[in-house]
């Protein structure tokens, strides 16, 4: 299908092709040791996880995306890590920095200060969740994703953090969620909105919606596009929708069209 002109407030449809996703085995890890050995167990090896999905709660897919893309991806990794790993006796999760680096597609970079900076920004930001009210099992609220962050000098190759208690139950055992392939974080590094759009559309598909109907304003808000930018659909289609859907169609196992 082909898009035509539209203004903010009008609803557009985005549809999915057949056989979009296969669901790989979901790995579950437990640990009971202490010290660095325990943190190693709490941070599963990346080679075991490359094909995995994160069960990202719908309410945590639709949020105010004001932070940079790196921080958004790290948030998804935090959610996944907390689903497959245990916290320590003090309630902290320990995620390996190299795990984050690899999934961000930074294989040739050892910019670990930037990774910790991403955690700091996430820690410093209060976020509005369930932005569009799609998750009826989850109350809409504003809170941080992580509420405590250990200093990097105390954690070595790991980053230690605590989840917000209002979000942790939904993260550990989500009732309504999107299945998002972790490897797509690196594959959909560009264009800017490819991975956020992939998350949003994956959520629609996971909930059985083969056609996602969103107004232009809703889609802009979901992607974190603020202000009057792209208020006309023609500009939005040219600069945002067309290049980002092309990246999704070319690099993932899904085919998406818009109307």
Per-range role (PLM):
Residues 5, 9-259:
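Charged, alpha-helix-forming regions
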């Amino acid at each position: 299908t082909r898009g035509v002109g539209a203004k903010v407030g009008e609803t557009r449809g985005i549809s999915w092709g057949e056989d979009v996703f296969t669901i790989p085995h979901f790995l579950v890890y437990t640990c009971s040791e202490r010290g660095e050995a325990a943190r190693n167990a709490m941070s599963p090896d990346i080679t075991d996880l490359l094909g995995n999905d994160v069960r990202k709660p719908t309410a945590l897919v639709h949020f105010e995306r004001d932070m940079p893309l790196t921080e958004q991806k790290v948030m998804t990794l935090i959610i996944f890590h907390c689903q497959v790993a245990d916290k320590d006796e003090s309630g902290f999760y320990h995620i390996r920095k190299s795990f984050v680096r690899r999934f961000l597609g930074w294989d040739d970079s050892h910019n670990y200060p930037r990774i910790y900076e991403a955690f700091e920004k996430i820690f410093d930001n209060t976020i509005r969740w369930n932005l569009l009210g799609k998750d009826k099992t989850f109350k809409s609220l504003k809170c941080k994703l992580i509420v405590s962050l250990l200093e990097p000098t105390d954690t070595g190759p790991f980053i230690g953090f605590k989840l917000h208690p209002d979000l942790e139950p939904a993260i550990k055992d989500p009732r309504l969620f999107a299945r998002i392939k972790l490897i797509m974080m690196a594959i959909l590094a560009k264009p800017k909105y490819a991975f956020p759009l992939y998350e949003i559309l994956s959520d629609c598909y996971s909930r059985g919606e083969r056609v996602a109907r969103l107004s232009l304003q809703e889609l802009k808000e979901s992607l974190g596009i603020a202000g009057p930018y792209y208020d006309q659909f023609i500009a939005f289609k040219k600069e945002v929708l067309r290049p980002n859907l092309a990246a999704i169609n070319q690099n993932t196992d899904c085919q998406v069209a818009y109307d």
